[in-house]
């Protein structure tokens, strides 16, 4: 949460924050164009993301699609102005390169029957975000109206591109 406040100049009250065992996520929307995502594994910043960040993004999209079933919504509509961060704890993480910029691990622990990082993150994000959107109409409306407005703006500007 503090990271998003400092790096994206977001208002502390607008940052949504979930914390669980071995995982913490925070996100908000800003007036900036594009997407800002930060990811961490065991306290190390993974600048190039990895399996945990992809699972975070994918589960976020899945939840939004559950609430806006329209086929006219694109990922870019969901993530324009999005600022988010994910931090997970993985036993014996494997990184793609020596600098630890990207997580390459696929499971949470080294045990053969360990849950995959993808399943762990997707389950956490979907459960927490769905609950929030069902229970808090202000947050639900803020997010969904923004996404719909961005999709409509994109469609309105499309003839200008052709």
Where are these regions (language model features)?
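GHKL-family ATPase ATP-binding module
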Residues: 1-162
């Amino acid at each position: 949460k503090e990271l998003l406040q400092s790096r994206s100049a977001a208002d502390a009250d607008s940052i949504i924050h979930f914390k669980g065992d071995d995982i913490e996520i925070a996100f908000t929307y800003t007036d900036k164009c594009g997407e800002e995502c930060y990811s961490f594994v065991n306290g190390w910043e993974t600048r190039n993301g990895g399996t945990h960040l992809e699972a975070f993004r994918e589960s976020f999209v899945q939840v939004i699609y559950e609430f806006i079933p329209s086929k006219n919504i694109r990922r870019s509509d969901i993530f324009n102005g999005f600022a988010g961060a994910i931090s997970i704890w993985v036993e014996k993480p494997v990184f793609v390169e020596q600098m630890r910029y990207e997580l390459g691990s696929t499971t949470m622990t080294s045990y053969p029957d360990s849950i995959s990082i993808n399943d762990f993150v997707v389950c956490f994000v979907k459960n927490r975000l769905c609950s929030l959107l069902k229970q808090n109409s202000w947050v639900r409306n803020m997010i969904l109206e923004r996404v719909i407005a961005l999709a409509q703006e994109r469609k309105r500007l499309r003839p200008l591109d052709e």
